[in-house]
Amino acid sequence: MNKNKENMEKLSDALDNLNNKTNIIYFLVYDTRNNPRASVKYIYDLALTLKEDGSNVKILAEDKTYSGVSGWLGDKYNNLEVVTIKDDRVEIKIDDVIVVPEYYSNVLESLANIRCTKVMLVQQKEYIFETLPIGSRWSDYGFDRVITTTELSKKYINDIFNECLVHIIPPIIGDEFVPSETTPKPVIAISCKDRSISKKIISEFYIRYPHLRWITFRDMINMPYADFANSLKECMVSVWVDDDSTFGTFPLESMKVGIPVIGKIPKNEPDWLSENGMWTYDESKIVEIVGTYVTAWLEGVEINDEVKQKMKDTLLPYSTEVTKNNILNIFDSFRSKRIDAIEKALTKIKEEFDSILDSGKETEQIS
């Protein structure tokens, strides 16, 4: 009887926390050591959106050496509390939520016996099996909800982990990205995950077009976020090559500041890709396209109005307001489902408790 009463109290407390939004939403992150990473910014954007809506959110890091993100994201996220696995006594409760990125699949086993809402976060589907034990499913460890960034990833996850409910939340293309009020500079923004590709493109461009050696290439990799946004809007065109990308924020950021994109279509073709840039499947054609565009730009030729409109239309589903509302709705659905489950469990225990009390009364009457 005492055990039932104790369980009822725990469930009632959990229900109060959920209804008052005082339960904790944990986001597990890795330490970038002050190196800008879009995947970590994505997590911080989720966390900050929920925090600003009144949720109790905490960043969960490995230990006290965690360097944070202020060095490359600024002070915007400073009000997000950071707790550590090794140094803080983190007690995850039944009403809490934990969000685990796909590259942290090696921690799932340690979370298997924890009763809470468990969410996998998949930004790169190629990393799903990198640390997940062979033959294991997320649901083996109690993870039955997934957040990902594209329809392609959602389809892949549904095919493999069909017991999971998959939600799409694209990255926020921040309001820091605004068109420049001045004429673009003769500068080409280039973003290639593989730095050897950047070097190859730049070297080949200068060899093929020696008369354009005065044109500058600006490597956009590993820039602090504010510097990145300010530098991008100064450029006349951007070049993007990233075959491993699942979503690809750089082209959308370029479109948002109003500069056209030249890029290789990655093997995982993004949802947003259409006639909104100068695209090719052949990486060897990138330099030729850049040379043609730069020559036309120097002669005063602009991209046509149809492409400009396509760029604007592409950005509509990725506005800050739309994405933030999507985040809030999805996490609210997690909360509602948890409330429903706890209410059912509480009702069942109360019925059992009442039944025990009733049987006790009957025993007294008989005796």
What are these regions (language model features)?
Residues S39-Y42, K155-F228:
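Conserved catalytic-core segment of nucleotide-activated headgroup transferases in glycan assembly
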Residues S284-E288, L298-D358:
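A charged, aromatic-enriched C-terminal amphipathic alpha-helix characteristic of glycosyltransferases
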Residues D243-L315:
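Catalytic binding pocket for nucleotide-activated donors in carbohydrate/polymer assembly enzymes
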Residues K233-T246:
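Acidic donor-binding loop of glycosyltransferase active sites
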Residues L108-E109, F129-L132, F143-C164, K200-I201:
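A short, active-site helix/loop in glycosyltransferases that binds the activated sugar's phosphate group
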Residues M1-I94, A229, I262-E269, N276-E283, ...:
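N-terminal pre-catalytic "stem/leader" segment of glycosyltransferase-like enzymes
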Residues V90-K93, P224-C235, K256:
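Short acidic alpha-helix that forms the nucleotide-activated donor recognition element
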Residues K5, K10-D13, Y66-G142:
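Extended catalytic core of nucleotide-activated donor transferases of GT-like folds
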